[in-house]
C-alpha cells in the first residue's frame, strides 16, 4: 500500500490549474454518467499528486473517442500535426480527456529531430491510433495497445483479426492478470496510465504529476503499477508520459479544465504541450445528437 491523503473532489475545480474552454448550455452530472474524479496526495517515498478518473463503461452512458490533430500530408509519413489538447477536446459532448500514444518528430537531412514541440509540427504516432473503426496509425500485433470493442469494453493488446473501434497505444503493460509485470526501481517521471477491471467494464485513467520538487516528483514503473493495482486494475498499461501527461475534466459550470499540473514550463508558468491525439470520454447521448 502507498500512504496517501485522499481528496474526493465534488468537481468544484476552480482552484486547480487549467484554461477555460467552451461550455455546454447545461453542465453534465458526471457522477450520474458514471465518472468519478479523485485526487490522491502521496507523501512517501516522494511527494506526488495522483489524478484518477474511474469510469463505468457498462451502462453505455459515456463512450470513448480518440481525437487526432489534422493530418498534414495525406498519404505521407506524418500522421498528425501537434495540436493543443484542449482544442481537440473542445466539443460540448466531451466530459474528460487524457494523453495516450508515444510519438516523435521526423529527422532533418542531417538526421536531427526537432523536439522543441510546437503547434502544427508534423509527427509520427507510435502504435494503434484511431476512432470509429478507422485507424490513422496502425501497428503490428502487440500487448501495448489499449482499445475498445463494439460493445464498449476496453481491451489490452491486439492480435490479427481484432477489430478495434477506438484505439490507442502505450509503452508497456505494467499490470497483467492482477499482478505487477515490472520490477522495482527506475527513474521517476510524470506518468499517464490506463487500466481496467477483469471484464473491461470499468476504466481507470490516471495521471501522476512529476518533475516538480516538493510538490509532485513523479513515479517509476513499479510505483505506477502499484497504484493501478491498488485501484482494482486487472490490467494496466503505461502510456506516454513526461511533459505530455495531461488530464482534462468538465467542471460543474460546464467548463473544460486541465486538472493536473503538466511539467513543461515557459517563463515559470505551466505550458500545455501540443499533442497529436487525445483519448476523450464523451456523453453518449450528447455525442449522438451532434452527429
Predicted features and spans:
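Gly/Ser/Thr/Pro-rich low-complexity, intrinsically disordered segments
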Residues: 13-291
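Bacterial N-terminal signal peptides
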Residues: 3-14
Amino acid at each position: 500500500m502507498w500512504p496517501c491523503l485522499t481528496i474526493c473532489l465534488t468537481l468544484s475545480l476552480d482552484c486547480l490549474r487549467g484554461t477555460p474552454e467552451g461550455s455546454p448550455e447545461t453542465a453534465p452530472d458526471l457522477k450520474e454518467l458514471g465518472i468519478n474524479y479523485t485526487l490522491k496526495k502521496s507523501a512517501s517515498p516522494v511527494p506526488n499528486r495522483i489524478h484518477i478518473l474511474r469510469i463505468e463503461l457498462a451502462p453505455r452512458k459515456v463512450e470513448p473517442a480518440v481525437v487526432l490533430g489534422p493530418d498534414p500530408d495525406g498519404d505521407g509519413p506524418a500522421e498528425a500535426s501537434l495540436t493543443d489538447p484542449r482544442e481537440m477536446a473542445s466539443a460540448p459532448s466531451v466530459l474528460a480527456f487524457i494523453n495516450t500514444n508515444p510519438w516523435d518528430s521526423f529527422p532533418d537531412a542531417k538526421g536531427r529531430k526537432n523536439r522543441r514541440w510546437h503547434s502544427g509540427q508534423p509527427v509520427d504516432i507510435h502504435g494503434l491510433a484511431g476512432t470509429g473503426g478507422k485507424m490513422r496509425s496502425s501497428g503490428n500485433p502487440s500487448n501495448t495497445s489499449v482499445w475498445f470493442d463494439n460493445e464498449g469494453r476496453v481491451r489490452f493488446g491486439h492480435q490479427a483479426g481484432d477489430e478495434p473501434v477506438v484505439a490507442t497505444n502505450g509503452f508497456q503493460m505494467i499490470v497483467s492478470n492482477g499482478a505487477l509485470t515490472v520490477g522495482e526501481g527506475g527513474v521517476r517521471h510524470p506518468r499517464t496510465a490506463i487500466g481496467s477491471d477483469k471484464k473491461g467494464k470499468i476504466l481507470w485513467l490516471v495521471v501522476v504529476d512529476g518533475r516538480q520538487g516538493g510538490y509532485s516528483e513523479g513515479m517509476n514503473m513499479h510505483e505506477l503499477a502499484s497504484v493501478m493495482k491498488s485501484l482494482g486494475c486487472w490490467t494496466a498499461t503505461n502510456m506516454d508520459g513526461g511533459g505530455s501527461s495531461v488530464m482534462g475534466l468538465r467542471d460543474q459550470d460546464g467548463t473544460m479544465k486541465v486538472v493536473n499540473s503538466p511539467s513543461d514550463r515557459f517563463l515559470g508558468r505551466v505550458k500545455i504541450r501540443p499533442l497529436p491525439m487525445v483519448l476523450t470520454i464523451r456523453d453518449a447521448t450528447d455525442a449522438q445528437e451532434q452527429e
